[in-house]
């Protein structure tokens, strides 16, 4: 580089001068489970697209939704003393009362027969455990697109 501040043709600017493209903020996804392996499976499947926030009990879901405003909530059917079904119904009641914005809810079920419970809890979609990452990604994408 000469004294006039120009670069020879075809040379790259120093790293300190290279503009960094702005990164789009990642949307937040809330996972409610007390099982570490379930959290790890969900975070591995969806974490590349979303910032993953975890709560360990159904009673913590509403406060976490209020604080983080996730676009997607993943509820394990079996969590603590307030299970995924109760947490899902609680969110839907709060949404209908206009106290929180609407979120898409995916429930993680223990068996196919639990689909009845997920439907009654007004979940947008559900996946039966063990979690297949491809199925969970597709289910989450479809729930968010609905």
What are these regions (language model features)?
Residues 25-37, 41-43:
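Conserved acidic segment of CheY-like receiver
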Residues 29-33, 55, 73, 108:
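Conserved sequence signature across two-component system core domains
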Residues 56-72:
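Acidic, metal-coordinating helix/loop segments flanking the phosphotransfer/catalytic sites
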Residues 69-71, 96-104:
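His-Asp phosphorelay/catalytic-motif detector in bacterial-type signaling
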Residues 71, 75-93:
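Conserved phosphotransfer microenvironments
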Residues 73, 126-127:
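Two-component signal transduction core modules
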Residues 86, 107-125:
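Alpha4 helix (beta4-alpha4-beta5 surface) of REC/receiver domains from two-component response regulators
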Residues 131-140:
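C-terminal output helix
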